[in-house]
Structure formats: structure tokens, C-alpha cells
Amino acid sequence: KRKQVMAELNAHSNRMVLVFNCKVKNASDFKAWSKDRAAKYVYGCKEENTISYEWHISDDGSEATLIETFVDSDSMMVRLGNHGASPIAAEVLELVDITGVLCLGNAKQDAIDALSAWGAIFHAHHAGFHKSN
């Protein structure tokens, strides 16, 4: 059994969470692409400070949400840079319309500049805790 480690309550955190809300154009095409292409491609990037990359889809397949978590703002920028240089950057826009972007955490100015082009909303870290295994 793994020992669970809990950070101090209300400790400063540099962790970033990026949430993309999307309207899916074709559910079956999107499901295949997100699982067999996008997730595999991003996994293969071996970005050591990317914590997670997870797609979620509504029951009717009409909406999807991508949630990505990172150690800090700099590692989020590595992911965004890799995304921009990848073939999946164009592919995703053939499959979904991005309807909203939410950036949670203490984003640095370069991240704010990059994500503002997508109309991102920014919320700085305020309070709480996290657990790790």
C-alpha cells in the first residue's frame, strides 16, 4: 500500500490546471482520435512536468472537456509549445470547436499571452491542499 503524503493546508502551489471545453463535430471520429491518436501522441512526448492529459466526453458525445495538469506555468508552456509544433494541433480543430478555456493557477505572463489568444479565463491559486502518492 502506498503511503499518502498530504501538503500543508493552504500552502503555496505552482500547480497549473488547463481546461478546454469543446463542441464535438462527430462523436465516433472524436472518440477514436482522442484515444488512439491524441492521448498516445502526448504520452509519447515524455514531458516530465506534465502531470496529466485527460479527455472527458458527455453521454451524448456532443461535448468534450480536456483537462491538463502541470507542475508549474513553465511546464504548461512546454506542453503548449509541443502542441503548436505537433500534427494534432490542426487535427483537433477538424474534430471540435473550442468553446471555452479556463486556466487555473499562477500563470506567468508568457502563458497569459499565449492562452489569451483563445479567450482564456484565468483564476490564480488561492487556497486548499493536495495529496500525492
What are these regions, as identified by a protein language model?
Residues 84-91:
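A short, acidic, amphipathic alpha-helical segment used as a generic capping/interface helix at domain edges
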Residues 2-64, 71-82, 94-133:
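Short S/T/G/P-rich N-terminal loop/turn motif that feeds into the first structured element of a domain
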